[in-house]
Amino acid sequence: WSPVMMRYLERVAEVTPPFRVAVEVRNRSWMEGEARDSFLSLLRSANMAYVAVDEPELAWTVGRDFPVTASWGAVARFHGRNREAWSKKGVTVAEKFRYNYSDDELGSWEAPARAAAGEAERVFLMFNNCFRDYAVKNALRMKCLLGIACSPGEGVQGEIPFDE
């Protein structure tokens, strides 16, 4: 967080209508104390969505708070919780996002997603744990956990063979 970045977001809010904008931050400083209040207030006043992030809990990461700031939608992105890879420098994208969520981890988002659905027109849960087929399988599993058109066998935790 910085005053310069807040001014930048204010400018984004001025020039982007009628487009819908979602803002994802990657440093805890945005969601602490007065910075959090002013940041979320700006998003609400501009009808821009805060992007909640599921990522490893590290000293600098944002945390799993899911405030709804836009009437048109609530957004969460799932990057995986590969703490070891996120803590290292120079890791590949594949290493960083090599994370397959458990049902318990996905289930921890059920109540926040349902609460967001009561405040926003739509809820977007996007999976960016893009190693092999993990994002697709986890998205299908989340769909089933939320009871959204789940077919038998959909979201089953299995391996799809890939060439290395």
Language-model segments: residues:
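Residues lining hydrophobic/aromatic ligand-binding pockets adjacent to catalytic sites
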Residues: 1-164
